[in-house]
């Protein structure tokens, strides 16, 4: 709805969701100054209505197709990986054998920690000697698959709010002095590693094996 955003007289409070509601559309269209802008906005409303009708049908078709994958019954046993998330996993990853280790998957899903270092060597008695110091962290890698990151991040966020083994993992990490955002990252990475391991082995979820690493 860029036409609304471009009109300076339109109050900024309208940047929420009210502009999309059917009962509010006539009021918003009336605020546009010329017929061309109103036509474009009305066309976008028509497109939005059509997409809203197609969305549940597309979702149902996606899940129906995903159910035919042999990995479906395995992945559906993992907590907080519902039908849509599993369908997205299957479509995005296609096969777990693309990732030799969990760290390869973490990098692909944007869960790998990026480090930087400088001045790694110093001259001692005329000889270069490597300094002993930890590299500096620069956050998570940005070149990643956003769909996959959203799947694992969404599942981990849901797990932190529901009692169970995964929430216990989250609370245990915090109890060791880790900040909440880093604890969520730890849980997200654990979920990704768990998914990779179960998918490769064809095993169903077992909460007693949460500490088993993916290989």
Model-predicted segments: where are they?
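Short, conserved alpha-helical segments within structured domains
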Residues: 21-24, 77, 81, 144, ...
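Glycine-rich, often acidic, oxyanion-interacting loops/wings at catalytic, nucleic-acid
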Residues: 1-74, 214
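Non-catalytic, well-ordered alpha-helical scaffold segments
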Residues: 2, 38, 42-45, 84-87, ...
């Amino acid at each position: 709805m860029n036409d609304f955003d471009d009109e300076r007289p339109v109050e900024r409070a309208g940047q929420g969701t009210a502009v999309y509601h059917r009962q509010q559309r006539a009021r918003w269209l009336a605020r546009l100054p010329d017929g061309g802008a109103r036509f474009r906005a009305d066309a976008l409303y028509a497109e939005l209505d059509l997409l809203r009708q197609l969305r549940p049908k597309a979702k149902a078709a996606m899940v129906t197709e995903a159910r035919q994958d042999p990995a479906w019954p395995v992945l559906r046993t993992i907590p907080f990986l519902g039908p849509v998330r599993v369908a997205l996993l299957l479509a995005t990853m296609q096969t777990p054998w693309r990732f030799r280790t969990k760290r390869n998957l973490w990098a692909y899903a944007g869960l790998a920690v990026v480090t930087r270092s400088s001045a790694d060597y110093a001259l001692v008695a005329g000889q270069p000697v490597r300094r002993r110091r930890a590299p500096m962290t620069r956050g998570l890698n940005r070149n990643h698959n956003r769909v996959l990151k959203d799947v694992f991040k969404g599942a981990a966020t849901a797990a932190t709010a529901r009692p169970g083994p995964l929430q216990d993992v989250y609370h245990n990490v915090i109890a060791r002095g880790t900040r909440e955002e880093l604890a969520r990252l730890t849980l997200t990475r654990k979920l990704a590693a768990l998914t990779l391991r179960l998918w490769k082995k064809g095993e169903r979820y077992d909460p007693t094996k949460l500490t088993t690493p993916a290989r």
